[in-house]
A protein has these predicted regions:
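Structured domain cores in non-transmembrane regions
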Residues: 57-102
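Extracytoplasmic electrostatic interaction patches
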Residues: 87-167
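Low-complexity, intrinsically disordered/propeptide-like segments
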Residues: 9-11, 15, 37, 48, ...
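Immediate post-signal-peptide N-terminus of mature secreted/exported proteins
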Residues: 20-76
Length: 167
């Protein structure tokens, strides 16, 4: 009877320990996944800056120079699109460095958080609190990247239409 009770207690302790060690592993996987998301978003931001932004800016200047040669109705219809494109370009120039710094900081914080979680320096609940905070920042950054992708795509389509009207 006593041996059975000890075996049961030992088995219960093992199950509890496995349950405790499983949670940080899941948390570590979440940290790694979030870190990968931020790195992918940082790469996407660089692609936007190096390709989409450059092309959009070039096409914007080209279309702006076309206005003097176009019909007044086309100019009037295009003017709003050109102003909107210019606003997105200026916004991107201002926001991009801030986004890059935030992305670098989040990646660094997630690396520190993973280290602290693996070494049990922080409690599981505190790790989850920090992870939630970093997740909110990462989600905001992701939304900003998607916003610029979408905005630049729409602006590019508008400029392409204007370029066609010249031909």
């Amino acid at each position: 009877m006593r041996k059975t009770r000890l075996t049961f207690i030992a088995a219960l302790a093992c199950i509890m320990m496995l349950g405790c060690t499983h949670q940080p592993q899941t948390t570590i996987e979440k940290i790694d996944c979030l870190k990968k998301q931020v790195v992918v978003d940082a790469d996407a931001l660089q692609t936007i800056a190096n390709q989409d932004f450059v092309k959009l800016q070039k096409d914007f200047h080209y279309c702006d120079s076309l206005l003097q040669y176009l019909d007044a109705k086309v100019v009037e219809a295009s003017f709003e699109h050109l102003n909107l494109t210019q606003a997105y370009l200026l916004q991107f120039k201002e926001v991009k460095p801030v986004m890059e710094k935030k992305m670098d900081y989040v990646v660094e914080q997630l690396g520190n958080l993973k280290s602290d979680a693996e070494s049990h320096y922080l409690s599981d609940s505190l790790v989850l609190v920090y992870l939630d905070t970093e997740t909110k920042v990462a989600d905001t950054l992701h939304a900003q990247v998607e916003y610029f992708k979408d905005s630049f795509s729409k602006c590019q389509a508008s400029l392409d239409q204007l370029k066609k009207s010249k031909k």
